[in-house]
């Protein structure tokens, strides 16, 4: 699913001492509706390319499991059994991400819910037709939702969707999970000095000796302008959610592509949320949850996760105001002036 985010990484070396024989190689392919970038520091260009190709193939395999667009994806095959009472044997890969998603729902005060696809599809149509969805249609769609109605058989790795016509959408977690798995794959292939950019969900790995980390830039709310500060990351994941690309503007009100599971309505706050975490999965879904929750609750949510930080940027009188967890600024790149 296309889910562009207001974040980018910069191909700029932080330090070139002891750079030795390592060179940087960039590989890009379109995956999951977004450009996927794989950046590898390597002493062997041929081996780096082979590793990237193998990783892109793995991403294709994951897409065949996670996609809500591919009719025969494993996810959609599961959804066809919803409401029948049948337990469905699923792959360990799908079982794992569904468990993580339901944990996210329970941990986030219900602000993250992968069963919201019926409502999300109404809002996709609304953005395309440039008109708000009918309230009765939203209400009817919400009757088919609720992550609490996903049941798990942990022994036999089976899943049951209790409500009829349930449709799952992993768009708020799958790219972060995929980026994390892609980085792990590259490490197994011998390339820990690498970065994955899954359409804005970034997993920044290790770097060669002589480099301090990967530089990541963040957009300000409602604009393509970048913050003056850059993040400097190493062995961390980062994702930013905002509505700079996907939104519906009606009578001067901007409706985001992010839907509040409680109300079924698109959020209208002018907010960018950036989450730094130890893994891409948490960074991905936490940005969505923190975009929906009141700022105080969002900061409370982040406290539940070790080594995780958040920045919430809001517009007040056309100027950005920042709310941050205590450790967020420690990831800002230090300048000579500082």
Regions found by a protein language model. Name each.
Residues 2-6, 19-338:
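Mature catalytic core of soluble alpha/beta enzymes
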Residues 11-19:
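Hydrophobic h-region of N-terminal signal peptides that target proteins for export
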